[in-house]
From Swiss-Prot:
One GO molecular-function entry: magnesium ion binding
Amino acids binding Mg(2+): D9, E58
GO cellular component, one term: cytoplasm
Localization (cell): Cytoplasm
Keyword annotations: Cytoplasm, Fatty acid biosynthesis, Fatty acid metabolism, Lipid biosynthesis, Lipid metabolism, Magnesium, Metal-binding, Transferase
Family stated for the protein in its record: Belongs to the P-Pant transferase superfamily. AcpS family.
EC number(s) reported in the record: 2.7.8.7
Catalysed transformations (reactions): apo-[ACP] + CoA = holo-[ACP] + adenosine 3',5'-bisphosphate + H(+)
One GO process term, biological-process aspect: fatty acid biosynthetic process
Gene3D superfamilies, sorted: 4'-phosphopantetheinyl transferase domain (3.90.470.20)
Cofactor(s) needed: Mg(2+)
Stated name of the protein: Holo-[acyl-carrier-protein] synthase
């Protein structure tokens, strides 16, 4: 296997909080997939959840080589955890099509946060 895409991003959690305070759940609906939304409505720390999803999706879109645009939107990049808690990425719609075009066979994800920032790294291999 060889690396075909690397994306890294970080965001100040206060930035996400301010966006959320301005737009509320409209912001959450814009960036979350249907499955992520189902988890979001059940959690207490919504700002941290949104910050990690936002930063991970930015990193994933960079790894795809597209960035977030009119075709590849936030809600087409779905993050979840496997049974052991490892973060995983699922491509949907146009993002899935793009991942097939670049022959993505393996995805590596790391997401972290601390008091002020959230970070993510996504590596795609063929």
């Amino acid at each position: 296997m060889s690396i075909i895409g690397i994306g890294i991003d970080f965001v100040e959690i206060l930035r996400i909080k301010n966006i959320f305070l301005k737009y509320g759940d409209k912001f959450a609906r814009k960036i979350l997939s249907t499955e992520e939304w189902k988890k979001y409505i059940l959690i207490d720390d919504s700002i941290s959840f949104l910050a990690k999803k936002f930063v991970a999706k930015e990193a994933a879109s960079k790894a795809l080589g597209t960035g977030i645009n009119h075709q590849i939107t936030f809600n087409q990049l779905e993050f979840y955890k496997n049974k052991s808690g490892k973060p995983k990425l699922r491509f949907l719609k146009h993002a899935l099509k793009k991942s097939k075009e670049i022959q993505c066979k393996s995805i590596h994800v790391s997401i972290s946060d601390q008091k002020l920032y959230a970070y993510a790294l996504v590596i795609l291999e063929n």
